[in-house]
UniProtKB/Swiss-Prot annotation:
This is Lysine--tRNA ligase. Its EC number is 6.1.1.6. Belongs to the class-I aminoacyl-tRNA synthetase family. ATP binds at residue 295. It is found in: Cytoplasm. The gene is lysS. It is an enzyme of class 6 (ligase). The keyword tRNA processing does not apply. Its main location: cytoplasm.
Length: 544
């Protein structure tokens, strides 16, 4: 009996170990596999109330990754994305003028394009997002909430909701302090007079005709088949699950609150529409520089903006490196370099180019990178992002010089060290050019001033102490005497500054002042090795 218990415990331990080695995306996929369905539909939805940012589009990235994990294991799955474009405009989004206040309460689908460049308000904000998704290789079945109504997909569910309004009202009242009125109906017509949908209330119906009143004073009726109205959100969400056959849906934590949208919609789905609620994946908000993202205040960062400064895999990494309910703050300024350091290290560990601190860390980082990958390929040619911020400023628009700087500083994979730029494959050139463009965009858009520099063509007018002058002379002599790596030069410079009784800050300040005319600059050893050797030697000797 003891042996039986031992083996059961051992098997359970091994099973839990295998489970723990999987990424949370894969563990969700494993749970979905237990459901008896022919195909998994992983849904996501976004309100088109302005620019679609990385905060309110998280569910699309999570949904796509779950569906990919299911497909990888041989299960049928697809990702759907619903544009909630039948919702009313509640705030004027940045940077639209105040004149758009006249559209408050009007469904997004009925608001004109703010710049006259698209057919509608919805297309204006939706198009850049869908174009960005293509770069992430996220393929979604796109549904328009407005078209779902006008095409009649909701008609049967509207009829059921009106007929069973007392039951739905009772479900809502379970979670309300003040009960809904006895004549309340879970449907809001679009006012025939003012065009608003959030100021109307339906109070009676007969067949497909609904009677309503609006705060503008209008009292009228409409046919539900016209599509000129919408179900109350929590009823609409439940209906949508059944219409699309949804089996899993990620959503923001506000919907996951006790007694919130998911709880109420789940009951309606099961008790009114006879459909099992989908597997929920709630996630925490992403803040921007510690501040909640807001379309109306212009505090947001879009997937398209991310692609200007980082590869698509890096946004996936940012989202998937921690559990969905863990708080995430994004800062595209100096902290972005730390994020890219972590991403670059994770990538190198995944491809076996660098060792992790432990087996546990290696497995964790490999899992994160695996679900972050856009496509399988050999080690991407992505030199250190942080180093590239220096190299790009030195090389300017000269790709040959940039490539030489990377090679001299051992920033290329070992197998490429003996190759010239024109010997790289098309894929390697594409990856290198992407990183160059990303880094240059970051320098232009987000880099603090102290990161930016320009090597001075002429010796700046500087005053240096005697120890600083001797330090520069000795570094010049050292560089003239032999070739060395950045690490070797770094160690030698510390020996020299100690010999002259200099603090590191004062010593390196002397280097920066004679080369770029500033007190601060990039890491000194790599910086010196990135410049033309003869120029550096002459400048450190104050000869040029």
């Amino acid at each position: 009996m003891k042996f039986t218990h031992f083996f059961v415990a051992l098997i359970l331990s091994r099973f839990l170990q295998v489970i723990s080695l999987k990424h949370w995306i894969e563990r969700i996929a494993d749970e979905l596999k237990e459901r008896d369905v022919e195909e998994h539909v992983v849904a996501s939805g976004t309100s088109i109330s302005g620019s679609i940012h990385i905060g309110n589009s998280c569910d699309v990235f999570i949904a796509s990754s779950i569906a990919k994990s299911l497909k990888k294991d041989g299960f049928k799955s697809r990702t759907v994305w619903i544009a909630d474009d039948h919702d009313p405009l509640r705030k004027v989004p940045y940077p639209l003028p105040e004149s758009y206040e006249k559209y408050l309460g009007v469904p997004y689908s009925m608001i004109p394009c703010p710049e006259g460049c698209c057919e509608s308000f919805v297309e204006h904000f939706q198009r850049p997002f869908l174009e960005a998704l293509e770069r992430f290789r996220i393929g979604v079945e796109h549904y328009s909430g407005a078209r779902m109504y006008t095409e009649g997909l909701y008609n049967d569910y509207i009829r059921t909701s009106l007929e069973r309004a007392p039951e739905i009202r009772e479900i809502f009242n379970r979670f309300r302090d003040r009960p809904l009125r006895d004549d309340w109906l879970p449907y809001n017509p679009i006012c025939e007079k003012c065009g608003r949908v959030n100021t109307t209330e339906a109070y009676d119906f007969s067949g497909d005709t609904v009677r309503y009143r609006c705060e503008c004073g209008f009292d009228g009726e409409m046919d539900i088949k016209s599509g000129l109205g919408k179900l109350t959100w929590r009823v609409e969400w439940a209906a949508r699950w059944k219409i699309l056959g949804v089996t899993c849906e990620p959503f923001g934590k506000d919907h996951a609150a006790s007694g919130g949208s998911y709880d109420v919609s789940s009951i309606i789905s099961e008790e009114i529409f006879d459909y099992p609620a989908p597997y929920p994946v709630p996630y925490e908000w992403i803040t921007l520089r510690g501040e909640a993202m807001s379309k109306s205040r212009g505090v947001f960062f879009t997937p398209g903006q991310w692609l200007e400064i980082g590869p698509p895999e890096s946004l996936n990494y940012f989202i998937f490196r921690s559990k969905p309910m863990k708080h995430k703050d994004f800062n595209p300024d100096m902290p972005f370099l730390d994020l890219m350091d972590q991403f670059d290290r994770t990538e190198r560990i995944y491809y076996g180019m660098e060792d992790a601190a432990s087996e546990k860390e290696e497995q964790k980082l490999r899992n994160i990178y695996r679900v972050s990958m856009i496509e399988e390929f050999d080690l991407p040619l992505r030199p250190s992002y942080r180093f590239m911020t220096v190299a790009c400023q030195i090389a300017g628009d000269d790709p040959e010089r940039l490539y030489d700087i990377l090679r001299r500083n051992s920033q290329l994979p070992e197998e490429l060290m003996d190759l010239e730029l024109d010997q790289l494959t098309d894929k390697q050139l594409e990856q290198l050019n992407e990183r160059i463009e990303n880094v240059k965009n970051w320098l232009r858009l987000y880099a603090p001033e102290f990161v930016k520099f320009q090597v001075q063509e002429e010796l700046p007018d500087v005053e240096l102490s005697e120890p600083q002058l001797k330090f520069l002379q000795d570094v010049a002599d050292l560089m003239e005497s032999r070739e060395m790596s950045a690490e070797e030069l770094h160690d030698e410079m510390y020996s020299i500054l100690r010999r002259h009784g200099l603090k590191p800050q004062k010593a390196f300040q002397a280097i920066y002042r004679v080369l770029i005319g500033k007190k601060m600059g990039p890491r000194a050893a790599s910086f010196l090795l990135s410049l033309e050797r003869d120029f550096v030697i002459r400048r450190l000797r104050l000869e040029a």
